[in-house]
Amino acid sequence: MVTVALSLALIVQGPPPETSTTIVTAHQWVVRLGAEVGDSIWPGFRPDTIPVLYVVRGQGTLLLGWRGALPEGFLPIAGVDRSGWLSSADRGAASTGTELAGHPTAQVVVNDSQSVAALVGLTTHEAFHVVEAAAKKEGRRFGQGENSFLVTSYPVFDPQNEAGMALEGRVLAAAEEADGRARKRTLARQFLAVRESRHRALGPELAQFEQLAELNEGLAEYTLVRVVQLAARRRDFPDRPGAVRLRQAKLAGLRTLTANVRLSIRLRYYATGPALGLLLDGLEGPAWKARLMNENLTLQDALADAVGYRTQEVALRRQAESTFVIARLRSAADSGVAGLRALRRAQVDSVLAAPGVQLVVTVAGRYLGLCGIDPQNLLQVEPGVLLHTRWVQACAGDFQATFNTPVVQDRNAQMLRAVVGADSTVKVTTGAQGEVQIESPLVSLRAAQADVSRDGRVLTVKIKN
């Protein structure tokens, strides 16, 4: 591959030529490998088709791989196809999957010390996040992402959990260096025993956080490692030393998984995720990738299946399913759930069809919270929709409402609906500053800023920020 130096004749200010050359060379390798061996990185993955924004801090933003007219503000670069330059760089930019002019785009923040191998990997990592975002679907783990807010409550001061995590890193490092499938299999089973024991103590919410972080950032980092691995096999790859350094750094990271206390614990899964992927490669080749997506697995689940870790559990479950005819039980459950859905919808229709004023409360730009519920009288109607059959207290900043009547809560639309009594019993008071007060024997509502409108029997209150 011929290294292309950028001609910046059309640009008032540009990145240093050496940085430009490194970026363009790295991107050329991503395009080449994506076109030739994209499926070897991940099934259906074509990083060569995803445009990339390279943010060069203090210099500007380099756009490569763009198809069509350049986005506003970008100038073409002579000698580099499908490229553009913007002579400004967002100081707050991070490497991530993003969107530019309506197109899914990878974004990479560049520093002067990054090698070609590092940029090939990082570009692929961020391009994979674009794929994950496109694949996101309700009920599917792949593309879902983890609840990052849980880093605020993760037990970093728990020595038992920290020791267990450190042990996992050592086992994974040994598995990566192990010769032969039998040794890798033994170490994989040891890892699973340590991981599942630690997760039982950690609790289901944080265990799920770790597993989803490994699917999200861990798999993206696996594609980073994998693409550099594939690049280094090519004789003309210009940065084999960088590829070796990357592998050594990954192994060192596993051996010191909990040592760098200055960094967020979320970065641990950038180490365990690719290590699990490489271990699965060594155990069963590429087949695990499609299986992980098709069967909605975590990396941990995929590894357990690959080494038969839960063979006895599976055999006993199948025996019970055969003995007690799981197909009949599932059919009955399907029928029961369908009936429950119909019943809940009928309950909602009945509640809202009651005579009187139907009050609709909506909140824009913030979450409609609950300050009080009666759990004994709360029913799920469908995902995100609840029926409070007796009493509920809602709140959102300077808005508060107490209902002594059935209320339908739609958490997706941030909306409450309830019939709050006959017209003659409902008193609405509004103030010059947008204050609203609604009183009836069934509701007491106050808001500092809201719009009120009436359409027939429907009284709508839109709470403002």
Please provide the spans of the model-predicted regions.
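Soluble non-cytosolic domains of exported or imported proteins
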Residues: 20, 24, 113-122, 182-185, ...
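Non-catalytic terminal regions of proteins
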Residues: 24-35, 260, 270-272, 281-465
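Bacterial Sec-dependent signal peptides at the C-terminal "C-region" and cleavage site
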Residues: 3-18
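Post-HExxH zinc-binding segment in Zn-dependent metallohydrolases
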Residues: 70, 134-202, 206, 210-236, ...
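Active-site scaffold of zinc-dependent metalloenzymes
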Residues: 70-117, 123, 127
